[in-house]
């Protein structure tokens, strides 16, 4: 087999030139296709509205600010149509005749000729004896924007605009120069190329002195100037025309008048198209804090400038734009009602929203420390779709939905230098990057790289939003989902390709009709891939040979002899669900069914989770209610027990207090006399020496009549029984001391007796009474 292939290649390449034959001239190879050309391969015929033209613009030295703004305005469909149709649309024949002179196609061999000339010059310099060899230059980076721009200038058609104001019936102005550019692009027969806006720049520098230098200019200032110039040129030209008669047109010319009006003919109503597209209305409300009078003033705007904050969004910046502002100190408000400067509150409200909203992010801020403008690299997120609300009561439309269609990006560290590029969303070719002469397709997510937080100096500077509807947004999202599914399918097909042939979904299934032929045996086997992991196979029981798996690597090798049909292994049964190959529409249908099934399962799972969560909350509430009832019952029982114990304590105290009240002072005297008589009896036992009579027993419960002598008689009796003490006078206070100590012992004994009868508090009261009597 190898010899067969070698002989085939040898025979195929054996056409050697004959001796003396003239070598053929090397044909120049065409330049490789750019990414934009690859994307435009499947486009149909050229459209008349110019929406399928993608032209770059040549940079004449720091004119990137002009190129980026002009690209954004061209791809605004209503603005482009209004410019082309005012005052009248130039016939396509006239445009083609003019473009035949202004459109220049470069020589496709210019690059090869330039390279050959450089090689000849290099060889000539090397042959000179006294010339030092040229240092080797580094090869150009073919992925750099500079190289791509140079190649675009060498390979793409160049479109030079000329002054055609006379054909419009107008004097040359900035508007007529803009119309020349738009009509040249629309009338060209090439979808790609490069415009040379030299005539437009000459008119701009002629009328405005600030743009005559080659210094870096501000793109937002140029946008504001261009829109105002267009308005001024259109209104000035309309004022020169005689007033239109009010008589009705003739029947035969009515259709032509309607057609001319619809295409933007020169009528008083058509001069307002710039205002209808870009003009909005703001209402400034100022309330004096002294007299509380509110004054209003309407202001028109063609673009809206908003202040920026770190880590914010366009929505928050617009909300801050409409926030209240305090006018005080040096910025007081002159109130006509008060007749002087007063403190006031000011607020800007949006009364009418434009169809095309040009949103200027104020990236350049003047700093007092540096005494100059400084660029703010704040992160400001801008959405693809923006909904704005009119904040006044008498607004015409309550809200409006916008979609982002263009972003002007400033690349640089400050306002005095840098570079501008434009990222624009086209009608049916997605997002494109316009960098002067270079035009390249980019992904939708590429727009998110210019919020201000990415590495580098590129930040979004001007955002262009155009009016849209909710239906259009939903349709666009559906189309994006379909494109992503197709891209995923293509990626899977690319991955499954083997040996240059697409892998079929049923490649692992071998039918009985697959009989190897002699031509199959002669096919080379050079790109066959061997598996690096063990192949998955099913388990076969009882060693059934008919159920053995058929491996993809099991077909006869080209180097092996041809085997008869009887030696081929049996084919396993094919499942019914894989008997047919699914076509792309069926794949899409299956994918839709699969997505619908997944969505249904997701919704069912979500309902189950909600049901379980509701049941869990219900059980938790029941437990909480049960705990609350139990706590209330325990608290109620504790209160009842507290009330019962309080009532018992009150009854016991009232019982004791009642007994004391019944006895009164006599009961206290009875207790005191009993204790005193008992104590005197003890003293008699200890101190009587001469008397042999036993002490008189005192009954434990004696009445007042049984107590006998009073306190004076008891003292006299004690003095008689006790021996006289000659060391101290009779009335000395020392006589009571031994009595008190002995009385303490007696009281200690009586306390035990009293505890058994009347409690511990009675013994304390007896001691107190005894001390009071003895003292």
Swiss-Prot record:
The gene is creB. Residues 256-269 have a biased composition (Polar residues). Ubiquitin thioesterase component of the regulatory network controlling carbon source utilization through ubiquitination and deubiquitination involving creA, creB, creC, creD and acrB. Deubiquitinates the creA catabolic repressor and the quinate permease qutD. Also plays a role in response to carbon starvation and the control of extracellular proteases activity. Residues 586-653 form a coiled coil. Its EC number is 3.4.19.12. Residues 668-679, 758-775 have a biased composition (Basic residues). Residues 546-566, 576-585, 705-725 have a biased composition (Low complexity). Residues 55-468 form the USP domain. Residues 1-45, 113-146, 238-269, 496-775 are annotated as: Disordered. This is Probable ubiquitin carboxyl-terminal hydrolase creB. It comes from Aspergillus fumigatus (strain ATCC MYA-4609 / CBS 101355 / FGSC A1100 / Af293). It holds the Pfam family UCH. The active site is at residues 64, 419. GO terms for biological process: carbon catabolite repression of transcription; protein deubiquitination; regulation of protein stability; ubiquitin-dependent protein catabolic process. Residues 36-45, 589-662, 739-757 have a biased composition (Basic and acidic residues). The lineage of its organism: Eukaryota, Fungi, Dikarya, Ascomycota, Pezizomycotina. Keywords: Coiled coil, Hydrolase, Protease, Thiol protease, Ubl conjugation pathway. Interacts with creA, creC and qutD.
């Amino acid at each position: 087999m190898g010899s067969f292939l070698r002989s085939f290649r040898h025979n195929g390449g054996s056409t050697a030139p004959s001796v003396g034959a003239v070598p053929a001239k090397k044909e120049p190879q065409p330049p490789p296709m750019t990414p934009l050309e690859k994307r435009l391969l499947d486009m149909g015929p050229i459209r008349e509205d110019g929406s399928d033209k993608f032209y770059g613009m040549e940079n004449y030295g720091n004119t990137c600010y002009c190129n980026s703004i002009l690209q954004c305005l061209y791809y605004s469909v209503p603005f482009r149509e209004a410019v082309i149709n005012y005052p009248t649309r130039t016939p396509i024949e006239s445009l083609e005749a003019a473009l035949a002179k202004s459109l220049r196609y470069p020589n496709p061999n210019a690059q090869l000729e330039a390279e050959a000339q450089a090689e000849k010059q290099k060889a000539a310099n090397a042959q000179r004896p006294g010339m030092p060899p040229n240092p080797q230059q580094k090869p150009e980076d073919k992925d750099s924007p500079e190289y791509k721009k140079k190649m675009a200038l060498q390979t793409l058609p160049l479109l030079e605009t000329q002054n055609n104001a006379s054909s419009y019936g107008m004097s040359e102005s900035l508007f007529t120069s803009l119309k020349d550019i738009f009509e040249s692009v629309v009338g060209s027969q090439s979808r790609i190329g490069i415009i040379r806006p030299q005539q437009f720049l000459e008119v701009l520098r002629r009328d405005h002195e600030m743009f005559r230098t080659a210094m870096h200019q501000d793109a937002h200032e140029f946008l504001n100037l261009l829109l105002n110039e267009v308005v001024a040129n259109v209104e000035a030209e309309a004022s020169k025309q005689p007033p239109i008669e009010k008589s009705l047109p003739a029947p035969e010319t009515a259709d032509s008048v309607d057609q001319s009006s619809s295409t933007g003919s020169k009528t008083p109503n058509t001069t307002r198209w710039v205002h209808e597209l870009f003009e909005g209305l703001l209402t400034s409300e100022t309330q004096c804090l002294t007299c509380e009078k509110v004054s209003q003033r309407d202001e028109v705007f063609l673009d809206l400038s908003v202040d920026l904050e770190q880590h914010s969004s366009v929505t928050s910046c617009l909300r801050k734009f409409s926030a209240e502002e305090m006018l005080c100190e040096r910025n007081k408000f002159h109130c006509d009602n008060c007749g002087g400067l007063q403190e006031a509150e000011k607020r800007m409200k949006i009364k009418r929203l434009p169809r095309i909203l040009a949103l200027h992010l104020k990236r350049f801020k003047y700093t007092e420390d540096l005494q100059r403008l400084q660029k703010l690299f704040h992160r400001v997120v801008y959405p693809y779709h923006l909904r704005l609300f009119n904040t006044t009561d008498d607004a015409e439309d309550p809200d409006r939905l916008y979609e982002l269609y263009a972003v002007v990006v400033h690349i640089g560290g400050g306002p005095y230098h840098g570079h501008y590029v434009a990222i624009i969303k086209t009608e049916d070719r997605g997002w494109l990057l316009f960098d002067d002469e270079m035009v390249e397709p980019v992904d939708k997510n590429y727009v998110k790289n210019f919020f201000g937080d990415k590495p580098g100096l590129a930040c979004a500077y001007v955002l262009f939003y155009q009016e849209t509807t909710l239906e259009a947004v939903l349709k666009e999202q559906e189309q994006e989902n379909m494109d992503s599914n197709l891209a995923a399918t293509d990626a899977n097909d690319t991955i499954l390709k083997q040996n240059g042939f697409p892998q079929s979904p049923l490649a692992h299934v071998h039918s009985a009709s697959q009989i190897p032929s002699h031509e199959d045996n002669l096919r080379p086997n050079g790109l066959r891939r061997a598996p690096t992991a063990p192949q998955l196979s099913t388990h076969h029981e009882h060693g059934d040979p008919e159920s053995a798996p058929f491996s993809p690597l099991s077909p006869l090798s080209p180097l092996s002899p041809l085997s008869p049909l009887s030696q081929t292994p049996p084919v396993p049964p094919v499942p019914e669900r894989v008997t047919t190959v699914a076509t792309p529409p069926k794949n899409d249908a299956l994918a839709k069914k699969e997505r619908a099934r997944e969505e249904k399962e997701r919704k069912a799972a979500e309902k189950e989770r909600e049901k379980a969560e509701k049941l869990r909350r219900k059980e938790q509430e029941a437990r909480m209610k049960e705990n609350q009832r139990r706590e209330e019952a325990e608290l109620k029982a504790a209160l009842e027990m507290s009330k019962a114990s309080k009532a018992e304590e009150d009854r016991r105290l009232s019982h004791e207090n009642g007994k004391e009240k019944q006895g009164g002072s006599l009961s206290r005297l009875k207790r005191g006399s009993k204790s005193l008589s008992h104590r005197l009896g003890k003293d008699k036992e200890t101190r009587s020496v001469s008397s042999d009579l036993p002490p008189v027993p005192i009954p434990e419960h004696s009445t007042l009549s049984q107590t006998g002598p009073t306190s004076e008689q008891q003292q006299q009796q004690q003095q008689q029984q006790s021996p006289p003490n000659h060391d101290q006078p009779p009335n000395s206070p020392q006589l009571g001391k031994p009595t008190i100590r002995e009385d303490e012992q007696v009281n200690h004994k009586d306390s035990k007796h009293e505890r058994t009868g009347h409690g511990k508090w009675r013994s304390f009261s007896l001691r107190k009474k005894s001390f009071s009597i003895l003292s």
